[in-house]
C-alpha cells in the first residue's frame, strides 16, 4: 500500500495556521483543469512527513484562488475575455493561477507491514514544501472504513453529488448523481451500539428510520452478546418505542418493516393493541402494551405518571408512600369503580384522617387517570418483555395510539423497570443483568428542558446506563432541544440534513468534530439519505460523509397480499409459554373463580378473537394457584405449625409455586406470605403472628412466622 503516487500528488505544504480548538494546515495547489470535475470540499488529503510511509491526514475545509490571475490585473483581464467571448487560455491559468487550501488535520497515517494504521495524533510538523496528495483508491477505502472486518455496511462514501458506488447495483441512480470510482462502502461495527449512546439527527423524511432499521437488521443477523463474569456470553435485547408504527409491519405504501427481514423472523417480538393485517404479521405479536401496575412500585408509577408540578402535593406524597398491599387494593378498587370508588376505603388505604376529604378526592382523581391510562389486570406484558429481552430479541412497542403523555409514561415505566433490575443485579455473586439497547424516537420530548414527567428514567438510562450494559439510540429532529451534557456523551453520531441554526450549533457545541465546513454541508445539501457519521469507538474518530443504503431496496414485504399463514416466530413461542403457565395455574384454582379470558390471548387471527365478557385477573390467578399449592404442602405446613419458620423460609416455599416465567418472583412471594398465611390459618394475630428472634449470624433480628392454632381452612 502506497500513500503517494505520481498521479495523486497535487501540491505542497505551506505551514500550520491558527484554528482555535482545531489543527489546520495551509496548502498550495497548482491549477489543474480536472479540479472542476472532482469533489474538492470535504475531500481527504495526505501531507508527507519523514518519508512516503507516513503522512498527516486531513480534510479540505476551504479553498481560495491566488496568483497573478487572481490579482486586480488578472480580474480585469478575465472580465475583458468574458466580454469579448473568448476563453482564458489554459497555459495562462497553469502559469498564473494557484489555490490556497485550508486543511483540517485529522491525525496521522502510517504504513506498517503493508497495512494502514491511523493515530489521532497531531504532534508532527511536515517541512515547508512537503508534498500533498489526494488519497489513492486503496488508501481512500481504508480511511473511509471500507475494509473493516466483521462489520456492517451502512452506505456509500459520498461528497455531495459525488457517490463512490461504481458498479454496485444496490444504488438507485438519480439524474443528479455523479458516480465515482472506486466503490467505497464505509462499515460500522454494529456491536458498538451495545452499552453506548448513539445519536441520530435529521429532519423528517431524510432517512432516520431507514438507518435505524438497517442498523438493527444487520446487528441481529447473529444475536449480539456481551461477556459477563466468568466468560459467560449473554445475549443483548433491544426495545424500540415506535410512535408511528413504522418499524414492525409494512406501512400503507408497502415499505417493509423489521418483520420482513427473513433473518429476524425468530428475533422480532411486537407488542401492539392493533390487529395484524394478516395471519403472517399477527404471528409476530406477543400481546398488548398495557401494564399491570399493581406489580410496580407506587413511587415509580406516581413519579413518572404525574407531572412535576404535582409531585409535592400532599395526596401525591401519600400515594408514593403506600405499601405494596395497600397499593394493590387501591388499584383494584379504582379499576373497578373509578372516581366512584368508596371514599372511606380510599382514606383507609392512604392512612388519611376523616377531615382530609380534599386529599382523598385529589388522590382518587389522580389514580383514576393513571389506572385508565395504563392498567390492565390481565396483562403479562412486562414479564413477556423481560423474558424476550433476556433471550436477545428485538421488542417493538407500538405506542402510535398513545400519543403524548401516556406514551412517555408507559415507556418511562418500562425503562425504569429494566434499569432498576440491572442495578439490583449488578453486584450480586451470580448477576442476571439484561443487556438492552433502547431506541427512542422524538428524544427531545424526554431529554429536553421541558420538565416532562417521563424524563427521569430516560436521563438515568442515558447518563448511568452504560455500566449496566444499557445502550440507547436517541433519534430527534431537534438536537438543540436536548441537554448539551447528554449530547456530549454520545459515542456514535449520525447527522443528516438539519435546517435550524440552533440545532446545527448544538451539534457543534456537543461534538466539535462537526466543524463549520461539515455543518454547512448538512444545511446546504438537503439530500435525503446523505449524512455524516462519526464514532469514538472504532479507532477512526473523524467524520465520514455517507449516503445510507436503502432498507427498502434490500428487503420487500414478505406478505404483500396479506394472505400468508402464520409463521413460526419468537412471539408465538413466547405466547405459548406464558399461556401454558397461566393455564397450569388456572387448573389449580377452585372452579368458582372468574371466567377465563385466556383464549383471547392465544388467538393468532384478528378475525377469530372470541368475545370475552370479563377480563382475567392474571396476578390473582397466579397468587391463588400458589396458595393452593402451598396449602397442599403438608410436610412444610406441619413444620410451620409445630416450630414456626422464618419469613424468608415461607417466602422461598411460596416462590417454588410461582411460575418461572414471571420476572419478579421474589417480590411476589414476599407480598404473598401474609395473604397465604391468612388464607390457611386465619387473620394475623388470631391464627398466626410474626415475631423477631435473634439471628444466628448475630446481625439484625430475623422475622419468624408462627401459627397460633391449627389450620382453620
Describe the predicted segments one by one.
Residues 228-233, 245-255, 275-460, 535:
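P-loop NTPase motor domains
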Residues 462-543, 668:
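Conserved ATP-driven motor cores of ASCE-family P-loop NTPases powering translocation/secretion/packaging/pilus
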Residues 171-272, 484, 533:
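Glycine-rich phosphate-binding loop of nucleotide-binding enzymes
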Residues 1-155:
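Conserved ASCE P-loop ATPase motor domains encompassing nucleic-acid-directed helicases/translocases
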Residues 528-713:
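Conserved P-loop NTPase motor module
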Residues 219-223, 418-423, 457-473:
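Substrate-engagement module of ASCE P-loop NTPases
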Residues 146-186:
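N-terminal pre-Walker A segment at the start of P-loop NTPase domains
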